[in-house]
């Protein structure tokens, strides 16, 4: 499986992402509450909740905070009527973009998403317009310094579907999204500590960004991520190191 660009091509945005940590926590808590409310508080029987827990821990959320969020969902203390909404569209340079939202007001959410596309030279598409280009997977990321062959052997034994290493030494392990927690636990038991673990939408094709389209795509992603209702933004934009160096 070809590596995708979510991690490798957004490193230059890390400082900006760190500045949004408060908003990220709010969104993760919303997902924890919703997942627990819909599927129960046992992560072993609720893959969506387990994925949300892994994401929370990857973002250094405390156990106390995430446990309170789960308790809110299980106990019915949260009376909001959140629903998951997926929007699809085309960004600068013909990039395919998928936006996962949790919202209690569809009209508000679609207006904010459409505004971001309009401001950044893209357009909101119809259901199914780009979804066929993405596959839902679990992704476990390991920092440089590990032996790829050893990780691969352990990952495949744990039930992973594929493993990809990058030039900088980062390793991504891909799993069926429902098995993300199980595979991560097996690799942890084998001595490999993950840098992050989350469910993602992996693109099957790439759209190369140049010095003109790359900044527009990053602006679109930033605007979408600034929307309170937007949980995740997935895209197939590929930004080369040469182009990234100009940003």
Swiss-Prot record:
It comes from the Bacteria. One of its GO terms (biological process) is regulation of DNA-templated transcription. Coiled coil: none annotated. Keywords: Cytoplasm, DNA-binding, Transcription, Transcription regulation. GO terms for molecular function: DNA binding. One of its GO terms (cellular component) is cytosol. It is found in: Cytoplasm. Gene3D superfamilies: 1.10.10.200, 3.30.70.980. InterPro entries: Integrase-like_N, TACO1_YebC-like_2nd/3rd_dom, TACO1_YebC_N, Transcrip_reg_TACO1-like, Transcrip_reg_TACO1-like_dom3, YebC-like. Pfam families: TACO1_YebC_N, Transcrip_reg. Belongs to the TACO1 family. This is Probable transcriptional regulatory protein Spro_2779. It comes from Serratia proteamaculans (strain 568).
